[in-house]
Amino acid sequence: MARLFSPRPPPSEDLFYETYYSLSQQYPLLILLLVIVLCAIVALPAVAWASGRELTSDPSFLTTVLCALGGFSLLLGLASREQQLQRWTRPLSGLIWAALLALGYGFLFTGGVVSAWDQVSFFLFIIFTVYAMLPLGMRDAAAAGVISSLSHLLVLGLYLGWRPESQRDLLPQLAANAVLFLCGNVVGAYHKALMERALRATFREALSSLHSRRRLDTEKKHQEHLLLSILPAYLAREMKAEIMARLQAGQSSRPENTNNFHSLYVKRHQGVSVLYADIVGFTRLASECSPKELVLMLNELFGKFDQIAKEHECMRIKILGDCYYCVSGLPLSLPDHAINCVRMGLDMCRAIRKLRVATGVDINMRVGVHSGSVLCGVIGLQKWQYDVWSHDVTLANHMEAGGVPGRVHITGATLALLAGAYAVERADMEHRDPYLRELGEPTYLVIDPWAEEEDEKGTERGLLSSLEGHTMRPSLLMTRYLESWGAAKPFAHLSHVDSPASTSTPLPEKAFSPQWSLDRSRTPRGLHDELDTGDAKFFQVIEQLNSQKQWKQSKDFNLLTLYFREKEMEKQYRLSALPAFKYYAACTFLVFLSNFTIQMLVTTRPPALATTYSITFLLFLLLLFVCFSEHLTKCVQKGPKMLHWLPALSVLVATRPGLRVALGTATILLVFTMAVVSLLFLPVSSDCPFLAPNVSSVAFNTSWELPASLPLISIPYSMHCCVLGFLSCSLFLHMSFELKLLLLLLWLVASCSLFLHSHAWLSDCLIARLYQGSLGSRPGVLKEPKLMGAIYFFIFFFTLLVLARQNEYYCRLDFLWKKKLRQEREETETMENVLPAHVAPQLIGQNRRNEDLYHQSYECVCVLFASIPDFKEFYSESNINHEGLECLRLLNEIIADFDELLSKPKFSGVEKIKTIGSTYMAATGLNATPGQDTQQDAERSCSHLGTMVEFAVALGSKLGVINKHSFNNFRLRVGLNHGPVVAGVIGAQKPQYDIWGNTVNVASRMESTGVLGKIQVTEETARALQSLGYTCYSRGVIKVKGKGQLCTYFLNTDLTRTGSPSAS
């Protein structure tokens, strides 16, 4: 609570919060002054009509009201000027408070006999408005409220204490006044504290939303570039539209549709050519590179290939290690797609040939091209990558594998489309791989017409480079040469356009500098000229938060009812939880206790009254017990189980709006009833001895005593208790405006009926008694309890009605800003579907450190390759399955189900890298802090291997469920390996996150040489898993391509059934 009572404004938000607070308090201040002015205007004719008096019969009342009308009209004019209000906030507030005090003492000491109960309600009005409607800080408001209370008590105590006729019952009345003022101060401070907290929360939500919106506007542009760089425009639009629809509908990752499949973004294209290219000799070269050199080398090479692809109207599909493949004829059909791919292949070979000649490094390019049809699109839910599938794609892959280094290897289908543009020669049978040999179709090698000329030109340069190479590592020499190509870095094009670093600062730095302070005589509109565009937007938002906006047309709110225009948002607002309800109830209980104390001080305390208060007291205790029962959790847990449900009661009240409304309404009605309960035990009419005609006042003074059943002094205090009843309605800040209007109107009618009709004779009797010694004299208008009460009832009614609407507006505004901020944050989902969460901030956004390529080396990463070899046999292209589309639909289900495992907390450390056909690649240990592994022992640093094993088993379980529903018998073949890797992002046109290293290569070999239903690991990984409690058994020594003879192990688990791996 200490924060709630801190002086305004907080230093860290000095400029914007000062302006915002002034604007938010201007409206209630204007309403306060307007109510006083209108009451002064209406009071004169209304009182004359109601009392049947001439206005001139009460000159003191007429003079006081006219002076108040003139003074407060002047103050209204000053407060309505925004410039003056911002410049003279505290002096103007102090002047209004002093004017109200002067008016109160004017009413007190004019118009007749001064009594202890006189003008208590008006001073209560002053106290409450100081807190709720004047733009003062909490400390200033509390000081004004306490001074107002003490001044009334001291002035009347001193004035009446010296008058013998007034000393009777003086102390109980002053004590009752003190209770009233104390309750008024507490209620006012409570109301101000909650409103300031709500205002501060709304202010921060608005600025956070603006900050987020500005940042997201930039990030959306970046995401648009990113999506369009990895996906064709039509597919990016389609996927983005569905994501936004899913977010708006609040659905899960799997949208509800007529079938139970995930959305499939795959289409068939005919008349395309597919190019596969592999850098021969790169694996050996990469083993000599540092992480930075490796990522730079790959980015330069593939960046150059991307430039060549763009020149020849080809689309890069994916990078697989050092393998590059692209397609021509996507997404738009091109008649020259075969020629485009062949030209690109030749240019790639020339680029590598120049590199080899210039550096002397023994690398080459092997290219394969085939023409046909493909299925293209995106599968899975995470780490989207545009891909192509078909038998023709498989054939193009084998064309590269069975090709010749430095040559472009094409099929007969591609040759037919070249139409003689290039000379070719038959490829020898010895170059064919088993797949091509089994196919039996002739293949061809394209003859490069420029190869001989380039070899002659490059001879001298090659000799020079070879001399330099004697003093430099081949990898370093190659890196130096590749830098001259100047390939663009990933996301470089995003860092120069609307950089978030320059546009997303939440508050301008100059707002906090001592040299730049707010001249409060200037309005926000005047400041617009001094501030830049970004700062001016903050003031625009602040002006939108002004409570006067509730009376202007809005696209979010209904002008009259303040309901949200969107029915769904209105429903969400009304159903939102309200944990603060218990505090509303507690403060209302304080009002009830104040009423009880006052009644005990000024009434004769009949038994019926005590019984009524006892029952009500028990009902309040029951309500508070229910509201605060969550704080009894520890106590209840130690008790019997039959009481464990008690803490859930407070949660039920906080989350059930219907129950809250019922309890709130019942609580307010109880306070209303108990405020006048003492009057309900009195007769509605009686013969008052003081009102008998022609009776000597001396006789009354000597022979008649007030009966105990007629406590006249309680009449004005019952009226004051009614005012507290009005205040109790303002304590429920989140209660709807229409319900507050209904309750306030009900209480206004009931109170006026009691004091002006059924029990008006009591007020007349009290006045007659006070003035019995002054025949012919009549009290002033505000000296009669019934008239005084009616006037103050109307004043409090209209004042609280205005505050209720303002509270409703700010509660709804706070809800609206929170919802907008939440929606804007949800829109960032796209980025995490392209890059790992720990990588994206370093490449895009305000956290981007520099223009260097992203690369990171890790000492211990576990890499998984999980393939479904049976899918290759399952895949077929026929009219029945729409040329393979339905087969891919099933693969999409499999990959999507695999992706859904990543959202489970236990697999939060698993990072999906990519999919390669029906092979799933993932890694653990990539989100560890770099360098952390070297500071810990091996067992602890590689503890995430167990997570990867559990993930592999979960993949098998998922596949088993799919088999059950699709009537298939797919089985996983999994390879695991752990060790050092290099991670990075390469490719400017299509940024792609990947990992490289011997660890990755061996993990891939563990999968390709594995056995269905088994997890194959290397000997080192087997030892690490055994230290974690897993059981492995030796498979023996097997031949692994590129690695020679390796001893491998199988993990003792069956991927075809669900369950955890066996642990020894």
Swiss-Prot record:
Residues annotated to bind Mg(2+) 2: D278, I279, D322
Chain residues that bind Mg(2+) 1: D278, D322
CDD domains for this protein: CHD
Keywords noted in UniProt: ATP-binding, cAMP biosynthesis, Cell membrane, Cytoplasm, Glycoprotein, Lyase, Magnesium, Membrane, Metal-binding, Nucleotide-binding, Phosphoprotein, Repeat, Transmembrane, Transmembrane helix
Protein location: Cell membrane; Cytoplasm
TM annotation in the entry: 29-50, 61-80, 94-117, 120-138, 141-162, 170-190, 583-604, 608-630, 661-684, 708-733, 741-761, 788-804
Its membrane topology: Multi-pass membrane protein
Region (Disordered): 498-523
Topology feature Extracellular, residues: 685-707
SMART domains, sorted: CYCc (SM00044)
Pfam family, one: Adcy_cons_dom
Co-factor binding comment: Binds 2 magnesium ions per subunit. Is also active with manganese (in vitro).
Catalytic activity: ATP = 3',5'-cyclic AMP + diphosphate
Cytoplasmic side: 1-28, 191-582, 805-1064
Biological processes annotated in GO: adenylate cyclase-activating G protein-coupled receptor signaling pathway; adenylate cyclase-modulating G protein-coupled receptor signaling pathway; cAMP biosynthetic process; intracellular signal transduction
Regulation: Activated by forskolin. Insensitive to calcium/calmodulin. Stimulated by GNAS and by the G-protein beta and gamma subunit complex.
Tissue: Widely distributed.
Claim: Phosphoprotein is one of the keywords in the record: yes
GO CC, alphabetical: cytoplasm; dendrite; membrane; plasma membrane; protein-containing complex
Sugar-modified residues: N694, N701
The protein's role, per its UniProt record: Catalyzes the formation of the signaling molecule cAMP in response to G-protein signaling.
Protein name in UniProt: Adenylate cyclase type 4
Organism in which the protein naturally occurs: Rattus norvegicus (Rat)
